[in-house]
Amino acid sequence: MKKALVVLVVVILAAGAVFWWLSAPQTLAAGDLPDHSPDVENGRLVFDAAGCASCHAEEGAADDARLLLAGGRSLQTPLGAIAVPNISPDTTHGIGGWSTVDFVNALTEGVSPEGSYYVPAFPWTSYRGMRLEDAIDLKAYLDTLPPSDRADEAGGLPFPLSFRRPIGLWKRFLLPELPAAPAGADA
């Protein structure tokens, strides 16, 4: 009986280690980014095409008001509420303190600068095929917008959905591959 318990504990620990390894965030390093001078005007076009203001600006904001990306909305889902964060260039409450590679990893890999996964309510799954140059340009444009010192709202998904490590397994095994771009295509 004691031997069976030891074997069970070893199997559980081994399975946990495999889960932890398979679900680890895979991110880009700064050296993986292309040598690219940011184009703020292209970043503005990417901002408009990606619809960043539709979630991160105040509801109904128009013109210049839609450029204050203070977050604060609550996305109601069948699984719980998700607070929309401040993505203004504020260095305390927004993303102003993020490096370019932090931003690109959040946008295309769904991984925060701290190494945790974002839930796909943030549509990183749609942006993961974006050209890295476009992501760099978007960061440069966001850095030109007005900062907001609005703190992110508390809340989120209930346990166990708040445990995001399984997203790594979903990414590794279930997230569909991106279609290959035709040769010579400008994505």
Residues covered by each model-derived region:
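Electrostatic cytochrome c docking/interface patches
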Residues: 25-48, 165-187
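Conserved N-terminal glycine/acidic-rich loop preference
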Residues: 18-36, 57-78
